[in-house]
Structure formats: C-alpha cells, structure tokens
From Swiss-Prot:
InterPro entries per the UniProt record, alphabetical: DapH (IPR019873), DapH_N (IPR013710), Hexapep (IPR001451), Hexapep_transf_CS (IPR018357), Trans_hexapeptide_repeat (IPR050179), Trimer_LpxA-like_sf (IPR011004)
Pathway: Amino-acid biosynthesis; L-lysine biosynthesis via DAP pathway; LL-2,6-diaminopimelate from (S)-tetrahydrodipicolinate (acetylase route): step 1/3
Molecular function via GO: tetrahydrodipicolinate N-acetyltransferase activity
Keyword terms of this UniProt record: Acyltransferase, Amino-acid biosynthesis, Diaminopimelate biosynthesis, Lysine biosynthesis, Repeat, Transferase
Family from the record: Belongs to the transferase hexapeptide repeat family. DapH subfamily.
Name used for this protein in its record: 2,3,4,5-tetrahydropyridine-2,6-dicarboxylate N-acetyltransferase
Enzymatic reactions: (S)-2,3,4,5-tetrahydrodipicolinate + acetyl-CoA + H2O = L-2-acetamido-6-oxoheptanedioate + CoA
Gene responsible for this protein: dapH
Enzyme Commission identifier(s): 2.3.1.89
Phylogenetic lineage: Bacteria, Bacillati, Bacillota, Bacilli, Bacillales
Originating organism: Bacillus pumilus (strain SAFR-032)
An individual GO BP term: diaminopimelate biosynthetic process
Pfam (any one): DapH_N
Amino acid sequence: MKQMDANEIISFIQNSTKSTPVKVYIKGDLEGIEFGEQAKTFITGNTGVVFGEWSDIQEALETNKDKIEDVVVENDRRNSAIPMLDLKNIKARIEPGAIIRDQVEIGDNAVIMMGASINIGSVIGEGTMIDMNVVLGGRATVGKNCHIGAGSVLAGVIEPPSAKPVVVEDDVVIGANAVVLEGVTIGKGAVVAAGAIVVNDVEPYTVVAGTPAKKIKDIDEKTKGKTEIKQELRQL
C-alpha cells in the first residue's frame, strides 16, 4: 500500500460518502417493508435484523410505524468519513477494542493491543507491538520490530498538510505514556523513557528521558537487556 500524503488524506475525507450505519432489531408485521436498496435484511416471520444506512432505515420505520411493534437501533458513528480497516486478511495479531481506520498499513506479525487508536495514513512495520491505549495520529510511521508502550501518543499530522509526520525507525522502544510531537524522528535502535515528551529528533542507539526529552546515554548492554524485543509474542 502506498502511504498517503496529507493532501491525499484530505481529499479522501472530503470526497468520501459520509456514513451513519446502523443495526436494527425489529419486530412486527414485516412482510413487504422496503428498507432501502443498500440494506441487508435477515427477517424470519415477524422478527429480524436489518443492517443499513440510518437515513434509509429511519424513513422505512416512519413510513411503516403502524406495522412495527418494537425496534432497537444500534449505532456507533454519525456521518463518518473513514470506514474501519478490514482486518480479516491481515497477517498480524489484533486484539479486541483496537480502533484502526481505513488506509492504515500493518506489517506481518505486528501486534496491536486493546484500546489502541490508529488513524488514517499510519504505517506499522513488521513485528512491531502497539501496546494498550496507544494513539497513532494520522500518517505516523513506525518501523520494524519496535515496541510502543501503553498509553503513548505519536502525534498525527493531517493539517497543516505541509507538516512532517512522526517517524519511528526500526528497533525502537518507547516507554509507557511517552509523547512524540509532530515532525520528530526517533532514530534506529533508540529508547525513549516512560513519560518522556519528545520535541526534537532522537539519535540512533541513544536513550532519552524527561520533559522535554534529552539524551542521557548511549545504548549499552544493560539497556539492551531491559528493552529486549521478544519474537515469541509476535508469532501467529
């Protein structure tokens, strides 16, 4: 998949058909009720389930209200511009509760944990773990065999479109609740300490900590031992 630039993402959002999908449980005299051309209906006798756009189904419910005994509508978005990514054929481990929008690239054997939010245009490399409640903003790019710690934020850049996105190179470990601001590059093999706020580029194979984050040392054997990436967690 070619990574989208900011202007392509803006155009994608602008020109997309905005969607308010619903799932409707319905009971009544349902024979002959038309729920719209795009709706999918699973009706047996006087009960059923209907999937479709709220504008179509709302009209059908109002027109046929005398035939309907009971109805429950499930809805989780309104005028959404970007669908969720189809996960069925992705060769990665993606846990329940992760929110991943369309036009996101996920490498083989990546791991995305519960509560992670991955915005449009983001890239996640092979074997990288995105831990619980991580936020990857639009166009954020993470390389191979990284670990992005729980609650961390990689700032997104869609507007202004001229801004540079966050880039995390291969073999990087970012501790829990760290924040990496837009335009920052984290060099290969670097370690970002938990809670750090990174406002400037990080050199490869260095350790940074603090707010704002500053270099505290080069990577040594002790640090490597504490930040080892375990491939066993990435096997499918």
